[in-house]
């Protein structure tokens, strides 16, 4: 399966901006009323579209690559990307190792 590995750094960005970036990328669980209610806020990457083998590295399916790059450019994140071939099983299990 064709995929893209994206390496990025958030070293030059503020911590709160990095948090917002990750929330938009992966989504979050928002709790209200002291944790009584939970709402899932979805990100641009659905669950089976990416794998994070280590911090600051994402392996994404080809169809989501441009969305990730557009988000990184909007936040001023430095990144590099390479096209790779991977087994489709890593996206099903969401584990690389």
Model-identified regions with their sequence ranges:
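Acidic, metal/ion-handling microdomains and their immediate structural contexts
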Residues: 25
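Generic "edge-of-domain/loop-turn" microfeature
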Residues: 12-15, 65-67, 86
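Short, intrinsically disordered low-complexity segments
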Residues: 28-77
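Short, low-order "capping/linker" segments at domain edges
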Residues: 92-97
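Short S/T/G/P-rich N-terminal loop/turn motif that feeds into the first structured element of a domain
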Residues: 1-21
């Amino acid at each position: 399966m064709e995929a893209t590995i994206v390496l990025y750094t958030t070293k030059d960005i503020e911590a709160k901006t990095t948090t917002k970036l990750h929330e938009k990328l992966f989504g979050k669980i928002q709790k209200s009323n002291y944790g009584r209610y939970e709402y899932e806020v979805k990100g641009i990457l659905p669950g089976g579209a990416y794998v994070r083998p280590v911090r600051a590295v994402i392996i994404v399916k080809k169809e989501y690559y441009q969305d990730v790059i557009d988000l990184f450019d909007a936040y001023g994140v430095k990144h590099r990307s390479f096209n790779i071939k991977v087994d489709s099983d890593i996206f099903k299990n969401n584990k690389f190792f």
